[in-house]
Amino acid sequence: MTLNGYLSTDFHIKSPAKKFFQTCIETMDLPKDDVTVEIEEVPLEKKKTTFRIEGFQISEWYKSFKGTITPDMATWQNPDGYKKLEGTMTITHVEDNDCDRAILTVKYEKINSDIKDPGTIMDTFVEFFKEMDEYLVEDFN
């Protein structure tokens, strides 16, 4: 069994991509120096904007969830079983598209082969981001 790996998932967001991304950065207190924004032209004169932050440390921020995880959220998984637990968040917005896309990737290295892949950690992050998205949609309208 390998000790290193990646987990990746994507989900749609309803709130404005830029607002969602800024809220992620603020909520998770992530370093703004690691943020990249790429704007490119897409056929039919639309613009595609990609917001990205790479290599943010998940463990401490995830541990702050422990006391606040609701029954609706994923069960707790101890992040101390990993030497490395880094996240990358990418948000893509295309003009005139009703639904933006978020991609969350977790890169991990387990301390031993008895440790499970961090699937529960990933599920908890996704549930948090979906709840945040719903809040932003309500706040934006």
Curated annotation (Swiss-Prot):
Q: Which GO terms describe its biological process?
A: defense response
Q: Which Gene3D superfamilies does the protein's record reference?
A: 3.30.530.20
**Top-level lineage group:** Eukaryota
Recorded hits in InterPro entries, A to Z, give:
Bet_v_I/MLP, MLP-like_ligand-binding, START-like_dom_sf
Q: Which residues form a coiled coil?
A: none
Task: Please spell out the taxonomic lineage of the organism that makes this protein.
Answer: Eukaryota, Viridiplantae, Streptophyta, Embryophyta, Tracheophyta
The name this protein goes by in its record = Uncharacterized protein At1g24010
